[in-house]
Swiss-Prot record:
Its main location: cytoplasm. [4Fe-4S] cluster 2 binds at residues 192, 196, 199. This is Ribosomal protein uS12 methylthiotransferase RimO. The keyword Coiled coil does not apply. It comes from the Bacteria. It comes from Frankia casuarinae (strain DSM 45818 / CECT 9043 / HFP020203 / CcI3). InterPro entries: Elp3/MiaA/NifB-like_rSAM, Methylthiotransferase, Methylthiotransferase_CS, Methylthiotransferase_N, Methylthiotransferase_N_sf, NA-bd_OB-fold, Ribosomal_uS12_MeSTrfase_RimO, rSAM. Its EC number is 2.8.4.4.
Amino acid sequence: MSTRLHRRVALITLGCSRNEVDSEELAARLGADGWELVSDAADADAVLVNTCGFVDAAKKDSIDALLAADGLRAGGGPSGPADGAGPGPRAVVAVGCLAERYGTELAESLPEADAVLGFDAYPNIATHLAAVLAGTPVPAHSPRDRRTMLPITPVDRAAPALPPAAVSTGAVPLRRRLTAGPVAVLKISSGCDRRCAFCAIPSFRGSHVSRSPDDVLAEAEWLAGQGARELVLVSENSTSYGKDLGDLRALEKLLPQLAAVSGIVRVRTVYLQPAEMRPSLLEVLLTTPGLAPYLDLSFQHASPPVLRRMRRFGGSGHFLDLLARARALAPELGARSNVIVGFPGETPEDVDILAEFLEAAELDAVGVFGYSDEEGTEAAGLTDKIPDELIERRRVRVTDLVEQLTAARADARIGSRVQVLVEEVAGGLATGCAAHQQAEVDGGCVVRLSPGGAADDGPERLGVGDLVGVGDLVEARVVATEGVDLIAEFIAVLDRARPTAAVARPTPDRAAALVGRGVADGT
C-alpha cells in the first residue's frame, strides 16, 4: 500500500556515529516514499528521534529530546489537521537504541511519544509514520535480548533478487547524507560477540554481522561521489570484521581497496579491540598509503584484575607493547582510548596503575568515564560497588591527568609537518583535522593561510595563486597548540577536492529492492 502523500519529517540524531549512519538510512527510506526532510522540527508533520541508550546521561538526553519535540506541538497530536497546516509537529516517534532496548516500557512511561519503534521497523518506517499521522495505533516495540538470536550470517544468507552491488556498477546505497562536509562515516558491521561485563550493547544490537565487501566498497564510491574525502569506518567492533564471512583477514583485504577509491584521500578505522589486534592487521592499518596512522583502542583500564572483572584481556604491559609496535610502524601515530574508573572492586592501587599507564602511553586523546550500573549487565550484579562520590573523585583525578598528558602530547608535535583535511575556510584560516585527529572527537587543527586571501567564506586565495577550499588536503607546519588543538602554518596543497559529482537518489522501486541491504535494519 502506497504511503506517498506530501509529508514532512524532521530527524533528530543522538549518540554515536553509528546512529548517524542509521539516520541517513532512515532518511533515504523516507525520501524514497515521498517524505520531505526538514531541518526545523517545528516545520515537520512528524519528528523522528533517533535515540541513544548507552549510559544514563545519553538516555536522559534522548528523553529530553523527545519531550522537547512534544513541546513543539500546537495541541493537535496525530489527529490534528491532516494537511499539516497547523504549527508544530503532529507526531513524535522514538527509534534508535533507547527505543530498541526499552520498547514497551518506554512507551508506557513516556506517553509524549506517539510510537516507539525498534530496529526491525526500519524497513517500513514510512508506513509506520503514515499510520501514526492517520491516528492508527502502532504497537510499541517488544524488546528481545538479541544475544540469544543467532544471526543469519552473510555467508549463509540467500542472495538478494538483484545483482549484488560492486565497485563501479553505479549502485546507489539506500542512504542520504544529512550533513555536508568532507568527512563521512561508513558502517562496516553491526553488533558485537564480546561479553564485556559493563556493556549492554550486544543485548540490543545483537551479534556481530559484517557487511559484504562489495556493499562497503559500493557505498564508499557513492560517498566519494557525494563529496566525501575521508571515510571513518565504524562498527561495534571493527577488528571482528569478516569473521562471519569466513575470512579473518577480510578487513586487511578491504582497507587497501577503500583507500584506492577515487576521490578518497584518507580512511580511518575506529572501534578497535586490543585483544584482536593481530600483527598483520596492525601492519596494514599503519603502513598502507591512504590509511590514517591512527588507532582507536578501547583499553577501558590498565589494571589486570580490573580488566578480568570486566571480562576483558590484557593489562598495562600488553597495551604499552602494542603501542610500541605501532609506533615502530608509524612514528607519527595518533592514538586514542576510553577508560572507566570506579568499576566494582577497583582499588586505589588499580587507579595508580591506570594513571601510570596513561603517563607512559602518550595517547593523543582519552575519554574518561565514571562507572555506572547498566541493567541487564553482569557488572550490575557484582559486589564491592564503589560509592558514587568516590567514583567522581577518581574520575576528576584521571581527567585532570589526561588533560595535562594530551596537551603535552600536542606540544610534542610543534615543529612537525601534518596533513590537514580542510573542513572550513574563513578569515584567512583553514580548519580541519590532521591524520592523528578524528573529526569531532580528538580536537582539530587551525591552519594559517598566506596573506592576500579572498572573501571570508573561501576558498582562500593564497599569495602564490593557489586556492584552498573545503575538502582539500593541505600540508602545514605546527607552530603552536591550544590544549589538544594544533595551530599550523600553510605549506602546500597536496590534493585538491574535485567538484562533487551528481549522484542520483534511489528511485522508489530501487529503494524497495535495496531494503534489507543496510546493516541498520535490525541486524
